């Protein structure tokens, strides 16, 4: 796909058929249509008074969409991971890992001396993740069942926590971010990757987009400071935050 081009009719059909983005079980259900056709799980908390409603979470029944071939061009996962300062020996977390699309790519980057916690709120997603881990022999990937307000991660253990198209689905973002802040090392970083809410040409439902200003404002209120912003991906922001202690 050319970065600057709109999706073809065929591509739009893919979005309509299988809605998600790789996230917190949590893959969102991004699509041009206003009608979702993939199973979703309603946000577990009432709408927050922050100008938006948490998006619904895609069910594990639509998990095949997370590994669609088109995702390589649309989201450029390897370029994204190369830009977020991962290194051998790190302990990292893929929050809302789903079937492990990013976690399995992170595993060889941190290497045998590192580890990748792959968290998700759906046990069924973790079952599929464990199968993928076994097939790939990714012994340093550790599946973790998380919750709306609990990360399931050890305290002060994480160098980099990654949330790809996940944050906008959190039903209790303040509580979850507080738990995630506790899981980060003092110099740890939180990386948000979200579809650009500023760009109407991004063919994603509005509830599955965020403007950079909105994300930065909400993270600041939760005690995180923006330290880096990258905009080279076709459709998504990369926002890197440090916890304020």
Short names for language-model regions:
Residues 189-216:
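Conserved class I S-adenosyl-L-methionine
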Residues 228-245:
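Core SAM-dependent methyltransferase catalytic element
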Residues 107-108, 174-189:
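A short glycine-rich, Lys/Arg-flanked "PGG" loop and its adjoining helix->strand segment in the class I
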Residues 25-93:
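Class I SAM-dependent transferase core
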Residues 151-161:
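A short acidic, Gly/Pro-enriched loop at the edge of an enzyme's catalytic core
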Residues 20-23:
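C-terminal motif of bacterial Sec signal peptides marking the signal peptidase cleavage site
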Residues 93-151:
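Class I SAM-dependent methyltransferase SAM/SAH-binding core
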Residues 92, 161-162:
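Hydrophobic beta-strand segment of the Class I
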């Amino acid at each position: 796909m050319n970065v600057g081009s709109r999706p073809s009719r065929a591509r739009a059909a893919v979005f309509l058929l299988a809605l998600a983005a790789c996230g917190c079980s949590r893959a969102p259900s991004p699509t041009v249509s206003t009608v979702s056709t993939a199973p979703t799980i309603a946000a577990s908390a009432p709408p927050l008074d922050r100008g938006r409603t948490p998006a619904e979470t895609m069910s594990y029944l639509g998990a095949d969409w997370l590994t669609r071939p088109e995702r390589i061009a649309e989201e450029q996962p390897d370029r994204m991971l190369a830009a977020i300062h991962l290194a051998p020996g790190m302990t990292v977390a893929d929050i809302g890992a789903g079937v492990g699309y990013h976690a399995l790519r992170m595993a060889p980057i941190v290497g045998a001396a590192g580890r990748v916690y792959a968290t998700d709120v759906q046990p069924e997603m973790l079952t599929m993740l464990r199968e993928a881990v076994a097939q790939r022999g990714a012994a340093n990937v550790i599946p973790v069942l998380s919750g709306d307000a609990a990360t399931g991660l050890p305290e002060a253990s994480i160098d980099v926590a990654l949330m790809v198209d996940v944050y906008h689905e959190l039903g209790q973002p303040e509580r979850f971010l507080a738990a995630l802040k506790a899981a980060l090392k003092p110099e740890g970083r939180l990386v948000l990757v979200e579809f650009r809410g500023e760009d109407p040409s991004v063919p994603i439902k509005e509830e599955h987009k965020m403007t950079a200003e909105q994300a930065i404002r909400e993270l600041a209120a939760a005690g995180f400071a923006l330290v880096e912003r990258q905009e080279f991906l076709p459709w998504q922001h990369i926002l890197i935050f440090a916890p304020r202690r």
